[in-house]
């Protein structure tokens, strides 16, 4: 059961609105496989996000733009199979919703039907509001994503903080558009803490921050960053709670050494 936050045996979208009203923070982690999903679910995380970040941390690619809907569905199936309590949300990957609202609805329907997820996430603000509304009208819950949107990295000029200065007005407009379109939550990525706090106070839906300070209703991190499986350079907004990469490296070396020494398998591991 969770240490705090949403108190429910099975989390639904309505629980996020209730948590905001009650001033309860919500926790979100990414997951792309059954083993991590089961562990995080049992730990009490409120939402599991099958993010297109899998392109980077699972498939080893430089950008999220290349991951396909078919690949996302395979990963999401594994997560939903292992999850009993947390709400599972799946990213709509690049190229699956931009052409038209109809394309977006068809992609979202595939995700819901083939994975058993509870919602989809889509990047964009004012320009994507009509698409969000169409997905919601099809009976599919939506999480928005504004601020820095990784699928737009080239048009944004790279990994750049959004919502500073004059652009803060756009952030508010995007947030309101996402809410009015029917999303039940919105991710705020790489925006100034004060701007994220203002958006959070302005909206009635849940805000989930990543690199957006602690004034949002909840937080999300890529688990390989948060728990140190990724041994490379990490974003400034990541707090490392474990060093799993180093632990795995040391364990692999110990395994190799035992094989070379002829001590594995021993009597205890033999029939």
Curated annotation (Swiss-Prot):
Enzyme Commission number, as recorded: 2.1.2.11
Database matches in CDD domains: KPHMT-like
Pathway: Cofactor biosynthesis; (R)-pantothenate biosynthesis; (R)-pantoate from 3-methyl-2-oxobutanoate: step 1/2
Keyword match Transferase: yes
Pfam families in alphabetical order: Pantoate_transf (PF02548)
GO terms (BP aspect): pantothenate biosynthetic process
SUPFAM superfamilies: Phosphoenolpyruvate/pyruvate domain
GO molecular function: 3-methyl-2-oxobutanoate hydroxymethyltransferase activity; magnesium ion binding
UniProt cross-references to InterPro entries, sorted A to Z: Pantoate_hydroxy_MeTrfase, Pyrv/PenolPyrv_kinase-like_dom, Pyrv_kinase-like_dom_sf
Entry annotation: catalytic residues: 189 (proton acceptor)
Uppermost EC category: transferase
Cofactor(s) listed in the protein's UniProt record: Mg(2+)
The entry's keywords: Cytoplasm, Magnesium, Metal-binding, Pantothenate biosynthesis, Transferase
Localization per record: Cytoplasm
Known role: Catalyzes the reversible reaction in which hydroxymethyl group from 5,10-methylenetetrahydrofolate is transferred onto alpha-ketoisovalerate to form ketopantoate.
Quaternary state and interactors: Homodecamer; pentamer of dimers.
UniProt-listed NCBIfam families: panB, PRK00311.1
Family, as annotated: Belongs to the PanB family.
Record-given protein name: 3-methyl-2-oxobutanoate hydroxymethyltransferase
Organism encoding this protein: Corynebacterium glutamicum (strain R)
The organism's taxonomic lineage, starting at the top: Bacteria, Bacillati, Actinomycetota, Actinomycetes, Mycobacteriales
UniProt gene name: panB
